[in-house]
Amino acid sequence: MSEEQITKKVIEILRAYVKDASLLEKATAETHILKDLKVNSARLVDIIIKCEDVFGATIDDDEADRIATIGDAVTLIQQKAA
């Protein structure tokens, strides 16, 4: 799966947790999930679990702690898929 495909899927997953959908229209790899998209930290756990389900990857707590941006999530998923 390409980086672009993974990014699109991650944004699709985020759509269910972001109250203001217009924020996702401008989202890039540098978009901070908690600050820019205004997702609370409890929801970030739900997002990570959903990513595990969708991508068939296991993300441990240390790895999850390093996810701050959309790009961080995409990079981690790419590493897990390799």
Language-model segments: residues:
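Thiotemplate assembly-line natural product biosynthesis machinery
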Residues: 1-23
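C-terminal structural segments of small proteins and small subunits
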Residues: 65-66, 71-77
